[in-house]
Amino acid sequence: MKLGIVFQGECRNKDNVVRAVQRMAKEKGYRVGAWKEGMRVVLCPTGYVDLGWVPVRSFFGRWKITGSCVSVPAGPGFHRAAAELIQALGEKEIKDMEWKDSTNYLEDPDFEALRRETFEPWLAEQLKQALEELDRDPEGEVRLFWDEDQYWPEKVPGTVVTPVGRFSRQWLGQRLERGALRELSERLFLWNEPGHDARFHRNCALKRLWEDCYFAPSDRSGEDAQINGLILDELEKSAQMDPELPLPVESYRELCILDDRGFGLPEDIPELEEEFAPGY
């Protein structure tokens, strides 16, 4: 079962909805893309809200608005932020809003319960299934939260591939056995807290390190410069917010050289322990 929200309503002027979304996105630092039949609001690298519209045949010339979001693997923090965005639209531009929230958070906005009673058990079940698959085929590999239309990383037997890193069966199994669901959710969900804390920025960097980065000089292309810069900015922001949070310091230093940027992390920042070097 996927966790998320679907919603619908009507409006008199779809352009007002577009402007309202753009205004809210600017206030929150989200990215927005719009086209003729809809738009997408990107709240984080693995989480977005889609909206679409079609004209309603009536004398008043109204528009039907539909939308949705899938909240995994982004995490409970994303779900909360998406719910707030959807609620705000229902209070302003979209009339007669109806929604269905698979987590019931919109009906009972208790974030800690959302995380503990919905997202963590869901993650445990996904990991349990992944490990059972590896037990049946120890030489196999499981891609978890991975878009099947996306490239396939080089195979490493006995591992689980995720957007924020590769993990061995042993590493995941040990934590599942001792019930360390909070540790697992903090590591595998990109956005696990209500706001943008240090771990959120670190996980955004990890997602781009593992999934998007070519580890190429920034002057090779505009894409390399953008990706390298985003990763470095996120890691430096994370260190400013929590100097004790482990970061991928070795990868950071490598990218600083590739980006021709001076080292900006404190020397005593702890190294994030990873079984495999970042990069698919």
Regions found by a protein language model. Give the residues of each.
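Acidic (Asp/Glu-rich) sequence patches and key acidic residues
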Residues: 1-280
